Each structure stands twice: as structure tokens, then as C-alpha cells.
Regions:
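Polyanion-binding loop/helix "lid" in catalytic or ligand-binding cores
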Residues: 179-228
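Glycine-rich anion-binding loops of enzyme active sites
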Residues: 39, 75-168, 299
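Glycine-/charge-enriched secondary-structure boundary and capping motifs
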Residues: 1-6, 86-109, 117-124, 129, ...
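Glycine/charged-rich beta-loop-alpha catalytic/anionic-binding loops adjacent to active sites
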Residues: 40-49, 131-132, 182-188, 209, ...
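Short helix-loop capping/hinge motifs at secondary-structure junctions, enriched
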Residues: 30, 133-138, 285-286
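Short, compositionally biased
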Residues: 161-178, 182
Length: 329
């Protein structure tokens, strides 16, 4: 059973809507957005190559990304940690330095949290409260036929960074005298270790007067996110491989790892890019076509259809969530 199916099972009969955040009417035309993210050592991060300051920053950033995915603005955060006695007070100071740095960058007030003892590694949970005008909230559902499918930034680079770190880790474990050489990989490493929520895109869309018809963030790969929007809106979509934004460093890492590793596979199934995937009405085309950092990658098809990708050879491929915790059961 995948993550989404498990959540649906556990929340059956509750008010949960299956979006990136819970939504509560705050009155005065505002909605409150509530989200929680948990990162577990050995599952979501590896302390062999994760600086604690980066980890603290990332934990807050990925929670803020959920707020961005609903077109909102983050306001307050709470951070809770469970740690074993192998972490010193100085180490936790470093972790919280990253937490505070991310909060300061995105004008979020750190208002509380909790600490607990862990018998194994570290667990960090971040809850963020945000706000959005009721007229501007964007859900995963809402896409309609002929809407444009758009994404921000580039895709697959975070996974490329993970591949580099795992390669160096394996080499180091085989030879402890080995000194990792990470020169030339700065971009993909930062994309994995220190992602940035795309609040800048939320701002650009607002300034242009564009409210997406549906939106989510790309946390488990483009294919998974497309399936989320398609399933929620009950619509299909068609995206074009040649339009997927992939950085040259991602392509370089793929060629180094294996001749059979394709950059498009990293984009579709890599995850942790935390870019925004959204749909807009065709009437907004002129407003977004030249907008820096936004790429039109396809369009919404008909009700009941599935997401597909068209290759440069004009072959149509049905998209499936290949990664761990995909949308499928």
C-alpha cells in the first residue's frame, strides 16, 4: 500500500481533503492553512552526508512548500524533535540554526515545539500555519479540459544530488581514506540538501493576476504529482518530454552514473525538487508565457483520461508513479 492509499484509509470519515494542507475558514475572507512534515533519520536523511544546519533548514522548507502549493503565505512554525544521546547540545544548536535561518528567510515566526528522547536516530517534525485569501486558494482539484500544465524551476536535480552523495558514500565506506570530490556538483547538491520553497512563484503569479486552477508541489517526482492533480480533478493530461526543464548538471550526473540512466527518469520519478506543478486557464497564457522560472509543459485533456508523456519520437507513454510512496496502491 502506498503513502496516499494509507492516508486515505486512516483518515476515512474525517474532514481531511487530501490536499497539501488542511484548510480552515478563519473568517474575514481568509483561510487558515495547516500542514505537518516529518523527516526520519535513515529514511528521509542520512547523517553521513547531511549537515545539521542544512537539515534544519530543509525540514522547515519542505513544510513551507505545502503552503506555497495552495497559493498561501506561511506565518508561524512549530518544530519538534526526538533525538538519541549521540547528539550533543552543540549539534542541536546547529540544527536549530538552520531552522531559524529558513524561518527568517520566509518571514515565519518560530512559536514553539517539543523535544523527546529517541532510542535510535533523529526524528524532526515541522508544523506550519499559513494564510490565503479565500478567493485565491488553490486545491489539487479544479483543472479543466484545455488548461495549460506548468511547472516551476527544473526537475530531477535533487535526485541527481542524492545520486552523487550516495556514490561518494559507497566509495568512502569501501576506503575510509578516500576524500570525496564534490567539485562541479554544487547546484545539484544544494537542490537536495537545501531546497527552497517556491514562494517567489506564488508572488509572481499573484502580481500577474493569475490564480492557478489546480496546484501541488513536486515532492516525489513529476509523474506522481501529475497523477495527484489528475486524480483529484478527474482529468487526464498530456505533457511533452522535450518541454520538461532539466538542468545540464542533472544530465551530466546521469551520464556519469550509467549509460542507461535517462535525465527524464530523474525528472519523472526522482523527487524532492519541491517545485510547483500547476494548471492555468488558457486565457492566462499571455500573462505567463514569458514569466521567468515557469515552463508550460503540456495541457489538460478529457475527463476520465490518464496522464501521458509524448516523446520526441511522438510515442505516447502512460505515466505511473515509479518511486517509493507513490500515489498508486
Amino acid at each position: 500500500m502506498g503513502k496516499v492509499a494509507l492516508i486515505e484509509r486512516l483518515t476515512d470519515g474525517t474532514a481531511c481533503q487530501g490536499d497539501d494542507c488542511a484548510v480552515v475558514d478563519a473568517g474575514n475572507g481568509l483561510l487558515t492553512l495547516l500542514t505537518t512534515q516529518t523527516l526520519v533519520e535513515g529514511v528521509d536523511f542520512d547523517m553521513m552526508y547531511t549537515p545539521l544546519k542544512h537539515l534544519g533548514y530543509k525540514a522547515v522548507a519542505v513544510a513551507i512548500s505545502n503552503i506555497a502549493a495552495m497559493n498561501g503565505h506561511p506565518r508561524q512554525a512549530m518544530v519538534s524533535i526526538a533525538v538519541s544521546n549521540r547528539y550533543s547540545v552543540e549539534a542541536l544548536d546547529e540544527l536549530y540554526a538552520g531552522v531559524r535561518l529558513c524561518c527568517e528567510r520566509y518571514d515565519v515566526s518560530l512559536v514553539g515545539g517539543d523535544t523527546a528522547t529517541s532510542r535510535a536516530g533523529m526524528v524532526i517534525t515541522v508544523s506550519v500555519r499559513g494564510e490565503v485569501e479565500a478567493s485565491k486558494v488553490v486545491y489539487r482539484h479544479g483543472a479543466k479540459t484545455h488548461d495549460l500544465v506548468c511547472c516551476s524551476g527544473d526537475l530531477g536535480s535533487a535526485y541527481a544530488g542524492l545520486l552523487v552523495l550516495e556514490r561518494e558514500k559507497v566509495t568512502y565506506q569501501a576506503n575510509p581514506d578516500f576524500q570525496p570530490d564534490l567539485d562541479g556538483y554544487d547546484y545539484v547538491l544544494e537542490r537536495f540538501l537545501k531546497p527552497e520553497p517556491r514562494m517567489d512563484i506564488v508572488k509572481k503569479l499573484d502580481e500577474a493576476g493569475v490564480v492557478p486552477t489546480s496546484m501541488t508541489d513536486v515532492s516525489r517526482g513529476l509523474a506522481d504529482s501529475l497523477l495527484h492533480l489528475s486524480r483529484a480533478s478527474r482529468m487526464g493530461c498530456e505533457v511533452y518530454e522535450e518541454r520538461l526543464p532539466i538542468d545540464y548538471q542533472t544530465s551530466r550526473v546521469c551520464s556519469e552514473m550509467s549509460k542507461n540512466m535517462l535525465p527524464v527518469s530523474c525528472a519523472l520519478n526522482g523527487g524532492e525538487d519541491y517545485e510547483l506543478l500547476f494548471t492555468v486557464d488558457q486565457k492566462d497564457y499571455d500573462r505567463i508565457k514569458e514569466m521567468e522560472g515557469i515552463h508550460i509543459i503540456g495541457y489538460v485533456t478529457e475527463e476520465g483520461m490518464t496522464p501521458v508523456m509524448v516523446t520526441p519520437q511522438n510515442t505516447t507513454i502512460t505515466l505511473r508513479a515509479q518511486g517509493f510512496q507513490g500515489v498508486e496502491e
